[in-house]
Amino acid sequence: MTLELLQAQAQNCTACRLMEGRTRVVFGEGNPDAKLMIVGEGPGEEEDKTGRPFVGKAGQLLNRILEAAGIPREEVYITNIVKCRPPQNRAPLPDEAKICTDKWLLKQIELIAPQIIVPLGAVAAEFFLGEKVSITKVRGKWYEWHGIKVFPMFHPAYLLRNPSRAPGSPKHLTWLDIQEVKRALDALPPKERRPVKAVSQEPLF
């Protein structure tokens, strides 16, 4: 199984109700050998049109956050908990998230084998932490998931609604957080392709 083959399979997914309203499947994009993987919640309107993750206003802000920290977007792999746009941009429902992560995200993680995962927002953080969480309480802290470092951060869409840069504001905290991610990235040794612990619920073939 390759990432390209997995992406091709995802284009015809009918596993949950989200397929009914989608225009495009938004599988993910970036470096298939990335050390850093960023996982959002779900595609928005612009992403649904283009088939690419984080290309709308939140994505443009994410680009600026990465650039400010000296992390080239093309070196990162970016995807979402669900690959199809939820109606009215609502958060994915638990059953939708479970179906999509079991079918696609876990396999993406196995194939890419990132060393750091940054979940953006509560829905993504809850998947990796395994419980209902408040993003304000878990952001900016290191966790471990199947041997991979996990560092939750605010979703850029939340930052757009809270534009203040004052000390202690979400934007200020995000600036501190992304610098911590950059320090951790810089401290990693050159990545070697290695077998990782199986995390998917289904075979890879």
Curated annotation (Swiss-Prot):
Coiled coil spans: none
A GO MF label: metal ion binding
Stated regulation of activity: Product-inhibited by apurinic/apyrimidinic sites.
Look up keyword Hydrolase and say if it applies. Answer: yes
- Which residues take part in binding uracil? 40-42, 54, 80, 155
Give the matching Gene3D superfamilies: Uracil-DNA glycosylase-like domain
Q: Which reaction does it catalyse?
A: Hydrolyzes single-stranded DNA or mismatched double-stranded DNA and polynucleotides, releasing free uracil
Q: What is its EC number?
A: 3.2.2.27
Q: Which domain of life is it from?
A: Bacteria
Q: Which keywords belong to this entry?
A: 4Fe-4S, DNA damage, DNA repair, Hydrolase, Iron, Iron-sulfur, Metal-binding
Under the heading CDD domains, the entry gives: UDG-F4_TTUDGA_SPO1dp_like (cd10030)
Q: Which GO terms describe its biological process?
A: DNA repair
Q: What are the binding positions for [4Fe-4S] cluster in this chain?
A: 13, 16, 84, 100
Instruction: Tell me, in a sentence or two, what this protein's role is.
Output: Removes uracil bases that are present in DNA as a result of either deamination of cytosine or misincorporation of dUMP instead of dTMP. Can remove uracil from double-stranded DNA containing either a U/G, U/A, U/C or U/T base pair as well as from single-stranded DNA. Specifically recognizes uracil that is flipped out from double-stranded DNA.
Q: How does it assemble?
A: Monomer.
Family affiliation: Belongs to the uracil-DNA glycosylase (UDG) superfamily. Type 4 (UDGa) family.
More about this protein: The 4Fe-4S cluster may have a structural rather than a catalytic role. Does not appear to be essential for enzyme activity.
Q: What is the official name of this protein in its record?
A: Type-4 uracil-DNA glycosylase
Q: Mind giving the lineage of the organism this protein is from?
A: Bacteria, Thermotogati, Deinococcota, Deinococci, Thermales
Gene that this sequence comes from: udg
